[in-house]
UniProtKB/Swiss-Prot annotation:
The gene is engB. It comes from Photorhabdus laumondii subsp. laumondii (strain DSM 15139 / CIP 105565 / TT01). The keyword Glycosyltransferase does not apply. PROSITE patterns: G_ENGB (PS51706). This is Probable GTP-binding protein EngB. GO terms for biological process: division septum assembly.
Amino acid sequence: MTIKNHNYHMTRFITSAPDIRHLPQDMGIEVAFAGRSNAGKSSALNALTKQKSLARTSKTPGRTQLINLFEVEEGIRLVDLPGYGYAEVPEEMKRKWQKALGEYLQKRECLIGLVVLMDIRHPLKDLDQQMIQWAVAMQVPVMVLLTKADKLASGARKSQLNKVRDALLALNGDIQVEYFSVPKKIGIDKLHQKLDIWFSQKAVQVENHR
């Protein structure tokens, strides 16, 4: 299989939607980014695409209340899902977001991969595990990025990485776990490579079904 090197810096914003009913037609291929409200999803998307404000970052966790879609090239999209688990968001809104997340993961046919971002200091909270379990149940491959890796010394960082990898082994899913830090540019290349592999694999599958 030939791995195509996609130009993520050409990525552009398409639309926002409150739930899957308001998303564009379920065609093409999508990789979704999920994580707690302070995990650094928007910063990761901006670092991947080398665009400072493609995904809106905020000092106030929980500002990503919509499903935000970005087009890498025709038919290939990145999806920024609503951040979850932020305490100051009203319960009704939390339930609404979680319903939107669940529906997207379980019903969106063009979803081919899920990137789950977790603060390396506080990984595998209940909702993180639920997202990964949903993906494994739907046979969607997962890349876990342990963000803010620069906040820990190398020994503690390695220990956290091993703990998370060991904890996820029991799920028997297609799960890769890596460090990630935007300021230190750790893990950005691995994310780029993983997305290229996912998009290329799907392109081959589509070609073989023609």
